[in-house]
Amino acid sequence: MLNKKTTLLLSTINQLTILYKKEGNKSYPLFYCYQLEKIVVFLRKQSTIAMKRIVLLLGCLLTVLCLQAETVYSPNGNVKVTFELTQKGEPTYTVWYKNKEVIKPSCMGLKLNMDDFTDELKLIESKTSTFDETWEPVWGEVKSIRNHYNELVVTLEHIDWYQLDIRFRVYNDGVGFRYEPRSGRNTAFPLTYYEVFEENTEFRLTGNHTAFWIPGAYDSNEFAYETTLLSDIHALTCNGSGIGTNKIVGDKTIQSPVMLKSDDGLYINIFEAALVDYPAMMLDVDTQNGYCLTSHLVPGATHAVAYMQEPSVTPWRTIIVSDKATDILASNMILNLNEPCAIENTDFITPQKYIGIWWEMHVPNHSSWDYASISGVRLKDMDWQAVKPHGRHGATTENTKRYIDFAAKHGFDAVLVEGWNVGWEEWAGRWKEEVFDFVTPYPDFDLDAVSQYAKEKGVKLIMHHETSGSVTNYERRMDEAIALMKKYGYEAVKTGYVGKIIPRGEHHDGQWMVQHYQRVVEKMAKNKIMLNAHEPVRPTGLHRTYPNLLACEAARGNEFNAWSNGNPPEHETILPFTRLMGGPMDYTPGIFQQKMDYYQAGNPCQVHTTLAKQLALYVTMYSPLQMAADLPENYERFMDAFQFIKDVAVDWDDTQVLEAEPGDYITIARKAKNSDTWFVGAITDENSRTATIDLSFLDKGNYTATIYKDGKNAHWEKNPQSYQIETKKVKNTTVLKIKLAAGGGCAIKLEKK
């Protein structure tokens, strides 16, 4: 005979079974597992044979229930994500796109100092929800963005009662997921403070995809991209020449984002979003056991990769997928996974075009950042008035006024001045802490006079804060530096992090530096200052939350063409699929004098594009902060082509990706903010091709197309300055066929009549 308590328990089991059969497609199975487990624990204490049989049956039922998969679809049904635990309690996920498997069952989890969320987990609860909103960015590629996803949150519990929520958001173009550890039922030793040792996120791919990648490195993302099969990735063979801190992690470690193309025509981008208070994610490549990418977090100076405080979350791990390459470039998923704007009054944020004292430091036989040929500089002991200048200093009062005049004449918003402040004599390669004070100008730069002159001309000045990697020094002096900017009316600053990081042992992409970049952008926002960060961690969509972060470099920019083996012609056709997925890049386009032997006989360096392609980059390489990077005197030689740079917008109401193939070509059309005028950019790699530009995106009516294109004999290496300009009438039924030279492009202004 069964006692009353046992009879009651069996009745409960029966009711749970009935409910499961009725509601099994919902989240209840997780609740059943939890309740049945408690029942099993009680029954195990009983000693009768009947009880043992019941325990065996319940154990089987518990196993079946707990292996139930949780599935969530995108709003349009194209993307499917399934979460389940293995029999060992290991969390796994799988991703499909249009019934094609994109990510095979892949492990998930975190290893902490206080717990291991990688196995022996049980499902406690599962919740699903739908979210749909439309929001307007302060600036951007489109006027409004729809944020529409279905969410699944699974709650897992370890044997020591700590809990882990894994939150999935599934969009029509992909999925993002993140980890949210918490104390759960463990009140004795809560996760108030904890350390992350490792993240166990896998991306198990379905085949030997083509990959567009750069080698894993904790302190630089300024490598040229490689295009290989996953099985042919060998990071240690990559050339890091010209990169100040270019130590490669290992032969099978690459950086995210990575762009992939499968044999069956799927385009897959793997990255992260909302990187805050956490190290950046590299990817370890394993092709010995299938084709698997595994998270590799950038370490810090100590034993842990991250130090966290509850409540906390990791960045989103993102997978964007489509059968069209154009959809990858059109995706807003990274932005949508970031928090809404945190700045109450954004009136001070204005997209803009600028010129600057910068390129003349890169080309041969021109200017320098430093003022004198001296060594052993100690800032506090220097009498700069007594120092003999070497005569090559670029940031002089007169030279700055020349740039201000050019900006005022041609309608540019601002002038960047690099090398204005003392300390450049020993700024690189010494791991020195006291390099700059960010407030003291060189003797030949009259800050008062220059600021007043710019004000009279209606031109803003952009401040420059190069840190040389000495971040502790910058943080100590930042308030004083900002006060100087406010005094002289500076509204924007370009920061730089060339060199090894101080605190010593930290990395550019580690948690400590990610926290620093966040402190800087927040402090600048508080002081109503716009920010352009060079050599930071690559962006992950944080400009939604802090739109004063106008742009970052965080990749191999145009400057490398002046003094290294340069950027291959395919470079600009890969960057939008990789680095620019996380945010705008200050690529510094607009170089009209491509060959460096113009400045120095026999110099082999050159920009690996035609002049027309440099114009097209203002459209294909999105940024609300665009530089006309060449010397003013070079623009004066090509004023008809320069007109496009003067005309092109930097803020947009609409963007249409017309053609795209990573590593080969891109054609993009953008509609200027509050205007009927469109601009088109088309670029190609080292192969010439014909761009097919369907103008059906135009409204009804007649337009005048001003077309800047490669000349008949143009070639990025042999004849880069050959271009043609033509004007023709078009409408929305017009399809343009434009020949792009090798390494070439075209730029078009479409003005409604």
Where in this protein do the model-derived segments appear?
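Bacterial Sec-dependent N-terminal signal peptides
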Residues: 1, 7-20, 27-71
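N-terminal accessory beta-strand-rich subdomains and adjacent acidic, glycine-rich linkers
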Residues: 71-344
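Glycan-recognition and catalytic regions of carbohydrate-active enzymes
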Residues: 154, 630-679, 713-719
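An acidic-aromatic substrate-binding cleft motif
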Residues: 309-402, 410, 414
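Catalytic domains of carbohydrate-active enzymes, especially glycoside hydrolases
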Residues: 399-420, 487-491
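Aromatic- and carboxylate-enriched substrate-binding clefts and catalytic-loop regions
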Residues: 418-606, 610
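Carbohydrate-binding surface patches
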Residues: 662-703, 747-749
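C-terminal beta-strand-rich structural cap/linker in extracellular carbohydrate-active enzymes
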Residues: 727-753
